[in-house]
UniProtKB/Swiss-Prot annotation:
Disulfide bonds join C1-C8. Expressed by the venom gland. GO terms for cellular component: extracellular region. Belongs to the neurotoxin 02 (plectoxin) family. One of its GO terms (molecular function) is toxin activity. This is Omega-ctenitoxin-Pb1a. Inhibits high-voltage activated calcium channels. Shifts the voltage-dependence for activation towards hyperpolarized membrane potentials for L- (Cav1), P/Q- (Cav2.1/CACNA1A) and R-type (Cav2.3/CACNA1E) calcium currents. In vivo, causes immediate agitation and clockwise gyration, followed by the gradual development of general flaccid paralysis when injected intracerebroventricular into mice at dose levels of 5 ug per mouse. The presence of a 'disulfide through disulfide knot' structurally defines this protein as a knottin. It is found in: Secreted. It comes from Phoneutria boliviensis. Keywords: Amidation, Calcium channel impairing toxin, Disulfide bond, Ion channel impairing toxin, Knottin, Neurotoxin, Secreted, Toxin, Voltage-gated calcium channel impairing toxin.
Amino acid sequence: CDLAMGNCICK
């Protein structure tokens, strides 16, 4: 997950 980039997809 990287909130800085704007993508938070952890599975």
